[in-house]
Regions:
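Non-catalytic C-terminal accessory modules of carbohydrate-active enzymes
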Residues: 74-79, 90-93, 97-103, 108-222
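Extended glycan-interaction surfaces of carbohydrate-active proteins
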Residues: 1-104, 136-137
Length: 222
């Protein structure tokens, strides 16, 4: 059974645990709820506190002295956000959760977009910039963010950045589309649904919703 397989008798603990660590995806459920315009999973202050902690403890401004026994997605003077950190005075399991020292791009984009959604714009953009600087076309291929292989799909979490900035929401049942952008004065955003895609633009107090391909059946615009 699981206990027999993962129990480490010598050290008296389960293997592959987070323990008292700070995990990059600790509020992942709230991220999904935010993107899908669902009810809150956690209190707002708890989510913001968690995202603050992820940036404070998991973001590494210089990889040169970062010890990583696993796969190397960042090195030397590069920056990145690690999977799980163990802040000072927090006990680290002898055998922690696998890949905890790595900087996986899909997780980094998820955390960064969530920071932006919850008002931590500068922190989120710093995390995104760290990824893109590693894949600048000189050191690595900018079109192939390697994780568990070439062209790994998890980096598509970067699409959530568009949703974070535009505040795009859609309710198919009510035929309602909405935009709650972090920039209120003027903006131009791309939107996409299963039936089509287009743009929304606000300029000089005028809002323009365009369908560039396919169709869009609406009853409400919020």
């Amino acid at each position: 059974n699981a206990v027999e397989s993962y129990w480490n008798e010598e050290n008296g603990e389960m293997k592959y645990q987070i323990g008292e660590g700070c995990s990059i995806d600790q509020v992942l459920g709230q991220w999904h709820a935010d993107l899908l315009n669902l009810d809150k999973v956690f209190d707002e202050d708890k989510v913001t506190s968690a995202l603050h902690s992820i940036y404070k403890y998991n973001f590494i401004p210089d990889m040169r002295n970062h010890v990583n026994p696993c796969r190397i997605y960042g090195m030397n003077g590069e920056q990145g956000t690690m999977i799980c950190s163990f802040p000072p005075n927090r006990r680290k399991p002898l055998i922690p959760v696998p890949y905890s020292e790595e900087t996986m791009h899909g997780f980094e984009y998820q955390a960064a977009s969530h920071m932006i959604i919850h008002g931590l714009k500068e922190e989120g953009e710093t995390c995104v910039r760290a990824v893109r600087d590693r894949y600048d076309g000189y050191k690595r291929n900018p079109w192939n963010e390697l994780e568990c292989g070439s062209n790994y799909g998890r980096s598509l979490a970067s699409y959530a950045l568009l949703l974070a900035y535009s505040g795009f929401v859609f309710d198919m049942y009510r035929k309602r589309i909405g935009f709650h952008p972090i920039c209120k004065d003027s903006y131009l955003f791309f939107w996409s649904l299963d039936s089509g895609f287009g743009t929304v633009e606000k300029e000089d107090g005028k809002l323009t919703l365009k369908v560039l391909y396919g169709s869009l059946s609406l009853k409400e615009l919020e």
